[in-house]
Amino acid sequence: MADEERVPAPYFQDDEEGGASDEGEGVDLIKSHGNLVGSGGEDSSDEEEDDDPEEARRVAEGFIAEDDEEEEEDSEARRDRRRRRKKKRKQNEQDFEVDEDDLELLAENTGQPRRKEAGRLKRFRRGSASPPADDEAAARQRTLDQIFEDDDEDEDDIRSGRRGVNYDDDDEDLPSVGQALRAGVARKQREVVGAYEDDGLDDFIEEDEDDEEMQGLDEEEREARRQQRREEKRKARLSGSAADPAKAGIDHEAWDEIHEIFGNGEDYFWALEDEEEDAFDEEKKNKMEYKDIFEPAQIAERMLTEDDERIKRIDIPERLQLACPGEEGLKLLERKLTDTELFEAAKWASTRISQRTAAEFLDEAGLFHRQRSEFINAVQLMLSYMLNDLLEVPFLFQHRFDELEHLTFDEVERQYRSIDLLTRRELYTLSGLGLKFKTLLVRKDQLRATFNKIHVDVKTEPIQDDELDGGLDAMPADESRAARVESSQRQRAIFEDMLAQAASLEEISDITEYLTLRYGQQMRDAQALTSNGTDQAASDLQGLTLTSDPLVSATPAFKKPSLVGQYERNKKTVLAELAKKFGITSDELASNVTSHTRQYSPRDPEESPFKFAEQFTGSAWGAHSPEIALAKAKMMLSQEIGKDPILKREMRQLFKDAAEINIEPTERGMTVIDDQHPYANFKFIANKPARLVPQNPSQYLQMLQAEDELLIKLDIDLKDVVLTRFEARLYNNYASEGVGELSNAWNEQRRDVIREALKTHLVPNGRIWLKEFLREESRETLLRHVDVLMTKRVQEGPFMSKSMMARNRDPKIEEEDRIPRVLAVSHGGGDPRKDVVQAVYLDERGRFREHATFDDLRPLSARQMQERELELERTRGKAEFVDHRADFVKLLKQRRPDIVVVSGWSVRTAELKRHVQELADTAHQEICDADRLHSDLERDQAVIDVVTCHDDVARIYQHSSRAAEEFPELSELGRYCLALARYAQSPVNEFAALGSDLTAVILDPNQRLLPQDRLRLHFERCIGAVVNENGVEINQAMTSTYLQTMLPFVAGLGPRKAHALVNAISTKLEGTLINRTLLISRNILTFQVFQNCASFLRIEQDMLLEADEDDVPDVLDSTRIHPEDYDFPRKMAADALNKHEEDLEGEHPSLPCKELMEDADPADKLNTLDLDNYATMLFERKGERKRATLHSCRTELIKPYDDLREKQSEPSLEEMLTMFTGETSKTLAEGFVVSVEVTRVQEGNRMQEGHIKCRLDSGIEGTIEAEHAVEHYTPGSVRLRDLVRPQQTLDALVRKIDYKMCTVQLSISPWELQHRATHQGKTPIDIKFYDRRKADQWNEHAAAKAKLRIQARRQNRVIDHPNYHNFNYKAAVTFLRSQPRGTVVVRPSSKGDDHLAVTWKVDDDVYQNIDVTELDKESEYSLGRVLRIEGMGSYSDLDELIVNHVKPMVHMVEMMMNHEKYKGADEEDLHRFLTNWSLANPSRSVYAFGLNKDRPGYFNLSFKANRDAAIQTWPVKVLPNAFKLGPADQLADVAALCNAFKTQYTTQASMARGAKTPYGGGRTPAPGMGGATPLGGRTPYGGVRNGMAGSATPGQGVAGGYTTPMINVASATPNPYGGAYGRNGAAGGYGAPAAGGPPGRPPSMPGAPPMMPPGMASGGGAPSYAPPFAGAGEPGPPPARPPVPHGMHPDRFAQAEYGGASQQSYGENSGGAGGYGGGYRGY
């Protein structure tokens, strides 16, 4: 061979890449220095040096010419350096040589014979990726196994389960790569060489030799032996002695001469080794690793850890590897179940799959009970596929569906009927159960191995005295050998029986704990040996927890039993003999209980228990008396009974069937859990059966969460009657059947044993187990519910617009529209001041094409139009305006989207949608006119639909880093629009792209109760089901990172394998996959992964250009058909086209399929085939069920990869309202009372009724019609502006919700407010199991404790201030009584720790309380940094509050009291003064001031207009440095106050003369006796704020001139009728009648009566309509019915007459016969 032909080449070199020419030609395996090619000794630099003989000559000459002394020094230094380097590294290099033994082993494992032949090393034969043209008929008959034999050479490695080496194969029949894939060696998948990167094929055969030759050696000795072998081979390689001279064309004689002349090279070996080590160290120094650059967290995030690399290269689906992590998990996956184990697994799993399968197939009364055997067989077969063949659920559901259905033929209708044996969701459940059963088998094997170590087989081995330590039933040392043999066999039989019955990991743990109890130290020693690695085979799976699967991870890890030292100590004493005298053992008791017969009965000793126990007393073992001895013996027995696995299983079942749940709130829970708290639902639950928990899983999960928060105590227990019954059952099987005093005495001792076992062991164990069992059951139930919700979302396909459906109906258009063109529009929050409208357009392939921005899409208002006209006039028509609406229409006409998606997160989105719909209609009309579209079909094709889609994914996307990386040029709102458009085209794509943010999608509020990893697993399953159902176009995904996000959900793949797949296609196939076969032939995927994912990777044929002869497209690669089934569609197509084999000779096997799929009507041709008959023939001849497969092939040939998803629909109106506003049915519903702000008041007229426009906190617009604001409303009867004003806050009742317009109809009618929904804001309770009695007791108790706690806190609180005292109000008054006026006391408040009360002395027996709110508190006892007085201001400390707030009010009080018009604190003296002065001056008015004792901080301004007028009183409020009268609140002194009074009085008198109702006027209620104000003469009611209504008296939210504000009236609507519109409904409107008055009735809300000042009506004298009520001290009956006063509405008068006025007041209700139901004393 020429020199240029002997270029070193990799073992596996593709023909395309050069290197070795063809299979018949060998490769030079000897390098110029004698090294084998591929041995690892060469690199690129070495090859360059070897190719230059001159350079080699100079190096050799320089080497030989070295000085001897320098040579010795250098060599010594090199040797020292070499020794140091050997200590630092484990291995110099890997040996690639494969000898004859290796080839023999490979042939043996593959089952292929090989011919013994000395000669060159061989390699695997190669095949082609596609069958040759001259052998198409044979190719069509190939099975999938034969396809995979055609593995092409590749330099990376062979996709096999074991490591292998490829050799030239000219004349030896070695197994193909496909056969090696299925060789079945022990570490098939686990040790596969990386499928996507070069791995030097290290130690392929060497490790097998380790298994055989190094038996019995520990790990260090094995490693030393391996190192020695590597060193020997390396030296041989370096010296060339390992090379076969025949391979280099040198015969043995010439080779011997070379050795005689030059030696074997060992003399200069040190020099070569030193150079090699230098190069090794230099390479190691220069080599950069990930860990040298990135942090560990970054490496893990990028999936570059060693575990990630292992997952990539192992031939096991990634999701299975993640479900079973680590080496132990891999061993679990590798274990193949036998047919017997599969049958047992099927029986075990079939009862746990679902309630449906249990009810329909397993229940004898089930609908399909006759198909029970078919169901079990299907379960067994699916488990075989999952556990042995490692096939994932999507593959099984798609390609093994024939095994998942049972067919019955209806003879009457002559058609098949199908019964679903397993659904897709049930298959996922079965997958988890299969892994769990595998784990169970491994645990059993471990436990059996441990038992075999500690248990002595007395038949074959001698027994030592201390070896048979088997518990209390062990035979004593002096018994015969036969008895010992029998005891040993019985113990083994018991153990095996327990192990066979164990059906869960908990029961395996029970058996382990039982063995530990029985065998004590022996068991612990065996476990210690296992945990220390002495018996590695038994401990490989110790501690394995399958973390990813919900069913498997539900089971806790293998728990080690606790030590029972006291039991063991007593067991080694004579007390064990005493315990044995009680009768039967725990094993025998368990046998009696489970068999329901008394197989074993105890025999009573002949002495009484205490007398019999005397012989077992002794201080050595602590039994000083018979009582203590019996107690210790009973403790041992109860422990054995309590630890018996069978009895524990019985107790668990009892708890599962009969346990009850009781909840008791803690002290903290009583305070925290109110009626609005989510936990209020179960706050007082009692006796709820545990079996009902799955009906409401979220409730139980909330219970556990509340218990973790220390808010409740969760108790799960049995009823006394149930526990007593079970105790009797145990006792009856444990007690003796004897009668008499002696038997009774012993049976009482036995009863004590049973009770102790129950109390100490069985019941606590059952309680703990059931608690965790219910947790897992609840989680699984809730996960299934969320699974259904997610499936519903991801199963939606693209929107199908009216235009798309019209184009699909058009016969002129051949290509079917599947994906719409989308324009997404949003203005985000919808604030016109800052939010613009943004639009993003995507074409039908999902490509981002345009982004546009518009300031506003609303039509111009009349004012804006007028402004534009004026601007045009000013500029003489030269002004230019931007018409955003026209621009939007232009965009629609240009892009012609099929749909426009409108969404956002404000209520204004609904308005935007209406505007967009208008513009879309305009654009449609203009398109039709421009294109002259006349027919309905043509016009429909131009329709632009306006829709709304779910935006939860878009909201997540807009803030994500992924969005910023993909579209940095877009704003967040633009990215939001882009995500909306993508969602409209394919929801599953958007969900798949979320990645780790997937669980941020809230489908159910209770999903927060679930573990996030399990929730994500179920979400990914839902996405994976849809992704695999619709496939992934692999070549499109290669060019789109967005589409690549779906690859991890393909069966067999995952994030790591999908990433590796993309990289492999990019590097090996230049980024384009021509056909599916290349995935395996080019070593892109390994066998198992390919088997799972092949049919879900779609290859669109119109995107491909034919490559070379081998790599040609296959039309079937664009279908759901798996390559293993390609023969079926090929045969079907050929038959449908009437083609024969000779017609297809030399053609591609799928040519008939291509012709059929391109046919105009393939369905008609395929309908001629009898597929059912063909399926029957296949089953009869080959035993293959292929009916569903054949019908699936038929469907795919007609419509390849047809989208099976349902077309996407808009969210419901309720869902849209929640999207736009955040309101849900729990926050907004009819009958709810909500807080609204008045935005506009529209008065009524003859044309329309008046109304009030409001806005809710969520932005929803509301309307209050006048008739729902005022009872019996008529236009003109009352001014709505007199009732409410803009920016005022009201409480309104929701009458009706318009979900489409996002508006509500409201009412503020007191009558309707009274009928508010009682359940608003409250958490519904579990009424069936709610303990009312306990709730009432707890509430009373909690109220009392809260009161005491508040008092204690008040007493304990200390504030460092001279004015602070721990006083209550009474104590403060007592203290201030002797203090001067203006003294201040700061004290604790009854409102809580964040309030203070400031009490100051106004006058004798008059004290004002000021409520101070503390803000910014460090703790509950510290003083707040901000002290706020509501409506007055905030202060930084107490000194500032006293100086700037209290002292100025004291000054104003002193000013008033020193004024000449102040007449003291006695109201009678004030009235007497006014009356006397009026009598003296009958034609003049008079006024004076007095102190209001009922309302500290207020003065009374009382006046008489003339002698005959009644005394009226207006309130004067004292403010810091000011008085307040009506709207005037900055009156600096008494003079200013008097002037304000005169001004306001004159203004109201003028209004009264014009018969106009004063704005907000409110009358002073007439007293019951004496001095009554005429009903017409109303004291102005100041139900308005400052600056409103001129002279109105300041309103306080209740009827009357002035009163203390009613509770929570801060935002009440002022009104003249007693605060009927206050925040608390009708609290002041028409409450309880005055004492002695008739019951109140709903007021009829007419207009307010006119103000009639004294002296202004009826010519200035006494009012003509003044009622003749009796004066003070002169009681007398009123007239039968007084006349209706002038100007007063009759309904209003009737209301006053029947006592409907407000009763909330300060002062005493006179309520006498002469009153009208509630006047105020002295007013």
Swiss-Prot record:
Cite the entry's keywords alphabetically: Chromosome, Nucleus, SH2 domain, Transcription
Q: Which GO terms describe its cellular component?
A: transcription elongation factor complex
Give me the stretches of Gly residues compositional bias. 1709-1723
The UniProt record lists the keyword Cytoplasm: no
Q: Where is the composition biased (Low complexity)?
A: 1663-1672
Q: Mark out the compositionally biased spans (Pro residues).
A: 1639-1653, 1675-1685
Residue ranges for the region (Disordered) are 1-247, 1632-1723
User: Compositional bias of type Acidic residues: which residue ranges?
Assistant: 13-26, 43-54, 64-75, 94-105, 147-157, 196-221
Positions of the SH2 domain: 1363-1445
Q: What is its main location?
A: nucleus
Return the Basic residues bias intervals.
80-90
The GO biological-process annotations, alphabetized, read as: nucleosome organization; transcription elongation by RNA polymerase II; transcription elongation-coupled chromatin remodeling
Query: Which InterPro entries does the record associate with it?
Result: NA-bd_OB-fold (IPR012340), RNaseH-like_sf (IPR012337), RuvA_2-like (IPR010994), SH2 (IPR000980), SH2_dom_sf (IPR036860), Spt6-like_S1 (IPR049540), Spt6_acidic_N_dom (IPR028083), Spt6_death-like (IPR042066)
Bias regions of kind Basic and acidic residues — which residues?
Answer: 222-234
User: GO MF terms on file?
Assistant: DNA binding; histone binding; nucleosome binding
Q: Which family does it belong to?
A: Belongs to the SPT6 family.
Q: What is this protein called?
A: Transcription elongation factor SPT6
Q: Which organism is it from?
A: Mycosarcoma maydis (Corn smut fungus)
Name of the gene encoding the protein in the UniProt record: SPT6
